[in-house]
Structures are given as C-alpha cells and as structure tokens.
C-alpha cells in the first residue's frame, strides 16, 4: 500500500472513530449502586448511542431497572440509595453536585411501567411540563406544543375532540401514550422506558412499539423489558444484566442470534429467568 493510500485509510478510520465517539449520548463508567448495605450493581460500563433504542434485558432483580433509574437520578428518591462510578450525558457528569436535577429530568424523561397520568385533563397532562419549565411564551405556543406532542405520540387523532376530558378516562394504552406525550412535551434528549407495555394488551403494545420506532428518529431511547420478542423488535442495541453485572452488550441481531456469553444464550432461550 502506498503512502497516500495509507493516509487515506488512516483518515477514514479516524473519521469513523470520531463519528462513533460523538454518537454516544450517555455513558456509564464503573457504575455501582447500593441500597443500604446491599449492592445492586457492580462496575457497570455501558454506552448509550444517540438516536437508537437500547434494550436492557435480564431476569427479575438483575439490576436493569436500577441502572435505568440511575440515568436520570430517580434513585435519589430512594432512602439509603447511593451510587459510585460515573454517568455522563453529553460528557457532563450527571451526579455533579452543581447539576440541576430538575433540568436533568427534563433532558432525560421517564415513562413508567404503569401508566400514571395526572388527575387532570388530557390537555393539562401535556401542558404541565412546558408551563413549569417556561417553554411557551404564549397560550398559542403552549397549545402548539400540546398538539405536536400528542401527534408525535400517535394520540392526537384519537383525543382531539375531548382534550379537556380527564386523562384517567382513557384506555390503558392511550394513557401510556399520553404519558409518552407528556415526556416529549418538555423536549427531552433521552427517553427512559421501564417496561412500558407490561400492563397493556397486545393491540396497545403493538401501538406503543410502533411509536418507539418512530420516536428514535428524534430521541435516544433506553427501554427495560422482560419480553425477548419486544427487545428484538424495537431495539438496535441490547444489554444483558444478571445478578447486578452487565454480562454482555452488542447489536440486537447479534445478541439474539450469536451471543458470546453462555448466560445470555441461556436467558434468551428460556433456560432461566
């Protein structure tokens, strides 16, 4: 290979490495989580790529939800919980004492296992976040945010004639999409989803899964799921947890067809879990 070709190859490799580095939205480094004296996570190193869906899988109690909650400091609300290691968002340490946790949770939104709409109207459920964060300068701007968020959550057409009805009056699947619209409304960069379909029927689950695929065009998504089929359908990256350890992480297709770790193979094939 001549010198020009070598330099061209080096430049191409360098550009690829830079692109890869810049595409990491969040990063966990040696993350350990303790509940009192009990250690729930052990030295977890995990990168969350930008504008992709990363699925966290593993048996109950493996630490996947604990790690998820660490990504926007929801574990701060649990008495006796402490974290060691480092988690960054755009290379900024989210556990820096100077960091505004309210602002962090606006940037890293959360959708919980059970739909939890506020006891307010559909409109007010979505308008609440933008209003308290000062994202709308007028009533018209606020209305635009509400409508756009409901559209992005694939819910607007179903509720446009009853925006002032109670959000709690919607079906379970609609309530979950309302919660997703509520998260979207404050313009997050990352959306965390903790088993968002576990309380939904198959039809509602399919709608939420379609929505997740659409949302990844604009948002980085991390989802905890017990459903191997769901992880395979919606994610591009999968991380396997077991007994508080990150066992393996990789492209979803490779993880489900040719995992390198026996524990991953055994879990995916139903030998334990």
From Swiss-Prot:
Domain of life: Bacteria
Enzyme Commission number(s): 7.3.2.1
GO biological process: phosphate ion transmembrane transport
Sample GO molecular function, one term: ATPase-coupled phosphate ion transmembrane transporter activity
Keywords for this protein: ATP-binding, Cell inner membrane, Cell membrane, Membrane, Nucleotide-binding, Phosphate transport, Translocase, Transport
Similarity remark: Belongs to the ABC transporter superfamily. Phosphate importer (TC 3.A.1.7) family.
ABC transporter domain segment(s): 26-268
NCBIfam families according to UniProt: 3a0107s01c2
Gene: pstB
Pfam families documented for this protein: ABC_tran
Species of origin: Brucella abortus (strain 2308)
Subcellular location per the Swiss-Prot or TrEMBL entry: Cell inner membrane
Binding-site list for ATP: 58-65
An annotated GO cellular component: plasma membrane
Principal subcellular localisation of the protein: membrane
Name of this chain's protein: Phosphate import ATP-binding protein PstB
Phylogenetic placement of the source organism: Bacteria, Pseudomonadati, Pseudomonadota, Alphaproteobacteria, Hyphomicrobiales
Coiled coil: none
